[in-house]
Regions:
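Conserved N-terminal phosphate-binding loop of PLP-dependent enzymes in the Aspartate aminotransferase
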Residues: 3-194
């Protein structure tokens, strides 16, 4: 991270970080970038910011914000009262419910359980990676059919890049929920072993 900051300063470039999916406590910290000891010039937020109500945010350092003048940055729908109220409620819920701590704790548990699962299926699962409740499990095969089989058993997951199962559960997930997720994967995965 330090070398990236040096390059940014050397080339007088802005560091813009997209926190649209990784932000709002999902990784166990409010912003995902906080895990890496860097300070961006601009951060973008959306999705989790208002719990499903459409909203986006553009955050910048004070130094950069002072370069904006009236009309430089605007939005046709900016400041929508409903969306802003929803965002305020989400921020309150994250703090009051200790959801960042839950994301960190249960996320670590999820990653540990998925790595244990990897030991049971080493020819199918090549890697488990992530932070908090933003986790990927890379497979040696396409994951679409696994996703469909899990869905038939009540587990909603996604497959990205063709062979990476993505786990992005709600911030209120419990260890019991993770145990259920692992049990379903233990039922589904044997069918995909050669």
């Amino acid at each position: 991270a330090a070398s990236d900051v040096y390059k940014r300063q050397q080339h007088d470039a802005l560091l813009i970080i997209d926190e649209i999916q990784a932000g709002m406590g999902r990784t166990g910290k409010f912003f995902g970038y906080e895990h890496f000891g860097i300070q961006p010039d601009i951060v973008t937020l959306a999705k989790g910011l208002a719990g499903g109500v459409p909203i986006g945010a553009f955050l910048s350092t004070k130094k950069l914000a002072n370069t904006f003048h009236a009309g430089d940055h605007g939005s046709t729908f900016g400041g929508n009262p409903l969306a802003c109220a929803a965002a305020n409620a989400v921020l309150t819920a994250i703090k009051a419910g200790n959801l960042m701590d839950n994301a960190a704790t249960v996320g670590d548990y999820l990653i540990t359980q998925l790595k244990t699962l990897q030991q049971s299926f080493p020819t199918l699962i090549t890697e488990v990676r992530g932070k908090g409740l933003l986790v990927g499990m890379e497979l040696t095969k396409p994951g679409r059919d696994i996703v469909n089989d899990c869905l038939a058993k009540g587990l909603i997951i996604n497959c990205t890049a063709g062979n990476v199962l993505r786990f992005v559960p709600p911030l209120i997930i419990t260890k019991d929920n993770v145990d259920t997720l692992i049990a379903i994967l233990n039922e589904v995965l044997p069918k995909y072993i050669d």
